[in-house]
From Swiss-Prot:
SUPFAM superfamilies: S-adenosyl-L-methionine-dependent methyltransferases. Its EC number is 2.1.1.-. One of its GO terms (cellular component) is cytosol. It comes from Mycoplasma pneumoniae (strain ATCC 29342 / M129 / Subtype 1). PANTHER family: S-ADENOSYL-L-METHIONINE-DEPENDENT METHYLTRANSFERASES SUPERFAMILY PROTEIN. Pfam families: GidB. InterPro entries: rRNA_ssu_MeTfrase_G (IPR003682), SAM-dependent_MTases_sf (IPR029063). This is Ribosomal RNA small subunit methyltransferase G. The gene is rsmG. Belongs to the methyltransferase superfamily. RNA methyltransferase RsmG family. Its main location: cytoplasm. Specifically methylates the N7 position of a guanine in 16S rRNA.
Length: 191
């Protein structure tokens, strides 16, 4: 993993955050801890879900987790950073260019209108598990994987009581206990 590129990413987020709202985090230390370190800790052992895969970060915003995943797993075949806000997409394009992220693009699109199909999807802070899974049904290839990053299991319990439980099989949970709890929830599309 390229630590100098991670540092550059943190600096890019902090600088852009002074001009428009990318995150509530202000210092480089906070940005590193909550955007970079958490993602590395949550995903570091799951390279097989990204190796030579077509990946999308839904509601990418400041590029977390997509940019960090591309730096952690440079062997990702293609990465689409998708957001509906032009300012954020322009920021993501700057990040892609500055960090020289190959086979990565930032797309200004509404997820419900996007038609590409992916092996792996990631979502952090976009919506509830049920809402994002509704998009994932269309965007994931058969047997594709979606990773949700949440702060509690409440939304997972709602998923368990929904009609979607037949469409997605939970694979695993991974907990990260830093200053705030983060939970990685991996699900496989059954359809």
């Amino acid at each position: 993993m390229n630590n100098s590129k991670l540092k550059q990413y943190v600096q890019l987020v902090q600088t852009a955050n002074q001009n428009f709202n990318l995150t509530g985090l202000k210092t480089e230390g906070e940005i590193y801890e909550h955007l970079v370190q958490e993602i590395i800790e949550l995903f570091n052992e799951y390279d097989s879900y990204f190796d030579h895969k077509k990946v999308a970060d839904l509601g990418s915003g400041n590029g977390c987790p997509g940019v960090i995943l591309k730096l952690l797993f440079p062997q990702i075949k293609t990465l689409d950073l998708i957001d509906s806000k032009h300012k954020k997409v322009n920021f993501l394009k700057e990040v892609i260019q500055t960090l020289e992220l190959n086979n990565t693009q930032a797309l200004c699109a509404r997820i419900e209108n996007h038609t590409e199909q992916y092996d792996t999807l990631c979502s952090r802070g976009l919506g509830s598990i049920i809402e994002v899974n509704a998009f994932a049904l269309k965007l994931l290839k058969p047997n594709g994987i979606i990773f949700h990053i949440k702060q509690s299991l409440d939304q997972y319990l709602e998923f368990e009581d929904s009609e979607q439980k037949d469409q997605f099989k939970p694979l695993f949970f991974k907990f990260f206990h830093g200053k705030r709890q983060q939970i990685l929830i991996a699900m496989k599309k059954n359809v």
